[in-house]
Amino acid sequence: MAADNDECPFCTISGDLPHPFLENKRRNEDNPTFVVASTPEAIAFLDRLPLTKCHTLVIPRDHYEMLSDVPAETAAEVGRILPAVCRAVMEVSGADGFNVVQNNGLLAVCPGRNADCEVSMRDR
C-alpha cells in the first residue's frame, strides 16, 4: 500500500518537488534536488550522494517498500520515463553504457548478509 513516509528521503524529495500539473501542491524552492524528469506518477532526479557521474534515481512518487508492492500502472509510468532518462544521462556524461539497478529489502544493499552467508563489496 502506498503512503508517504516521513522517514523516507525519497518521499521528502518527491513531496517537495511536485509535478507542475498537480494541483494544490507547492514546490519547496529550498530543495537542492536537480529534477531530470517529472510526471504525476514518477520522478527522476540526480542523487545527492552519487556513486558515479550523473547517478540518477527514478522512483514512483508514492512510497512502496518493495518493487512487488508497486501497482502495474505506476510501474509502467516509471518504466515509460526510464529510457529517456537513460538517454539523457548518456548524453550528458558521455558514457557508452549505463546500469539500471533496483534494490529490494535490507539484504539487497551491499554488503548483503543473512544467517547463511556474508557478502562484502570486495567479494563482488
Give short role names for the model-derived ranges.
Residues 1-124:
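HIT superfamily nucleotide-processing domains
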